[in-house]
Amino acid sequence: MNQFAGAIIFLPKDQTGTLMLEDILFDPAAAWLAQTLRAAGVERFLVVCHEDDRAAAVTCFPADASFVTPGDADAPQRLSAFLDGLDGQVLVLTAPVFLTDAGLAKLTAPGKLPRGESSGVFRLDAAALSAALAEDGSAEFEDVLRRCGEELGEASEWSYRTVFRLNDRTELMDVQYVARRLTVARLVRQGVRFIDPDTAYIGPNVRIGKGTVILPGTILRGHTVIGEGCEIGPNAMIRDCRIGDRVTVNASQLNESVVDSETSVGPFAYVRPNCHVGSHVKVGDFVELKNSVIGDETKISHLTYVGDSDVGRHVNFGCGTVTVNYDGETKFRTVIGDDAFIGCNTNLVAPVKVGGGAYTAAGSTITDDVPDDSLAIARSMQVVKKQWAAKRKKKSEKGMK
């Protein structure tokens, strides 16, 4: 049962910046802290930060969190109002800290707590803190915390540490390892397999379905969601994407996009933001997608750029296809219907539409719409000059004498 009705979190700033807004595995330390507390049932947050840090801090906490800066004229009143709305204990963190789930369990467990160096973590009754502040409004806040509450220490042995005071960026770097192992352990318990956990870097908000295998060199960031039975890696980076079930991503980068089930991506593919790749699609080697919709069962096997495009189902792209979407000022869209066949080395100069079932001949530069079930040929007629090379060689040899 959660023992904390709310949390007051300070984000101190020094000459090098605000340590709690520095990243631990791609997310600010404050976001890790907020996630740990929310998982334990803490619903109400009051964050004290520098005015310059407010915009960054807002992204780390729930939408209904309250924010106060030391210079706010009504800061004492807002603190009092926050405390008056709580019934029970409040957790107060006055220093940069990384708190694990196990650490929070120890903080909330009854009995003697581990002691060591100061952690900057306090627990106390919300009503008692409110009364003490009302009685002596000029007192230092941390003095009131020590007088009315209990500072919670941290174990001295590294292997047992669950509360990490972050005094500088070197300690922040050390905590990266702890955060990575905690994240991997959580995912393993949920049925995810790791070939080499020490080479996977996964942010705290990533969700992965059971049966998915994470290969070495994988980086997963942001609010990425990966389905069941996938194979990710080696050397894949995925940021803020939604990946379906049984998807393969091999040595590729995907950003802010959706990939439906049973699709394969890579190796060496680059999916840029705002793409929706359908199911049973092949996105092969050296393929780049940008701001495009790719229909089910389409194959883009190699050396192709598809940008600002709407592609139907069961389309085949030949090697070297380019959607020419930019004229130097404006981006234009390309539309390709179902069952179309795009020949190798085709340039599709947008805005242009290739109809359903239509073909483009290899080497064509398509500038006009192609009707359904038609063949477009846009290349020069081949001219063969017989014996031209032999004559040229003979002439060259004669000139050398």
Predicted segments with their positions:
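Catalytic-core segments of class I nucleotidyltransferases/pyrophosphorylases
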Residues: 98-186
